[in-house]
């Protein structure tokens, strides 16, 4: 309940200069207690979550609303275009202007299979499980993204990853320092916004891989309302 209330407040007021004290006053928690409980439930501290949500909204404004970089920067609460662009590039995987260009060509093409791999001694076979109740909304041949990240949050380009059409088993290298497995499914008929700034993706809960994992089965489901947004613009894996 706390995570839902806190993230709801942050999503509603993301344009404002919110501090941890503003959030703790709103929820009647001490800042330290709120930070601990929030981080345990969401996987990241409240102010870091707020920063991520601002960037997620900026993606949508750049793609769907046609705002330029400066307009999107100020609309989501930043006062410095340089700071906004640096953080956007770090967490989304490409600069804001490049994301707008990506949206233009992605709207006219069908993404081919992509592999972002590197030589490693460890590999894991990943099987994606989709409940029967969700298969219809995915349509035929959904886009299946599987990748490894340094943290449970899908920020920045994955260390290793693949894009495939349809639900297929993949053999994925696991690089040192990137043990977190992330999986997302995008419907086959999704528009460009759903590819680059998905509102309600089907995702698996972050899974920490161990040295003993040979085969991992992960079940996907709708992202929970308080979960961290999927910041990385996954089609940036494709060089175009």
Model-derived regions: residue spans:
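A short, solvent-exposed beta-strand micro-motif common in secreted/extracellular proteins
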Residues: 176-188
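Structured interaction patches on ligand/partner-binding surfaces of diverse proteins
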Residues: 188-225
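…primarily DNA-binding HTH/wHTH and HhH modules…
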Residues: 1, 89-134, 159
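Basic/polar phosphate-binding segments, predominantly the helix-turn-helix DNA-binding elements
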Residues: 17-50, 75-95
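Short, acidic Ser/Thr/Gly-rich low-complexity loop/linker segments typical of extracellular
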Residues: 153-168
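Exposed aromatic-hydrophobic patches
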Residues: 166-175, 217-218
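Short, ordered, surface-exposed loop/turn motifs in non-cytosolic proteins
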Residues: 133-152
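Terminal helix-turn-helix DNA-binding modules in bacterial transcription factors
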Residues: 8, 17, 41-75, 106-118
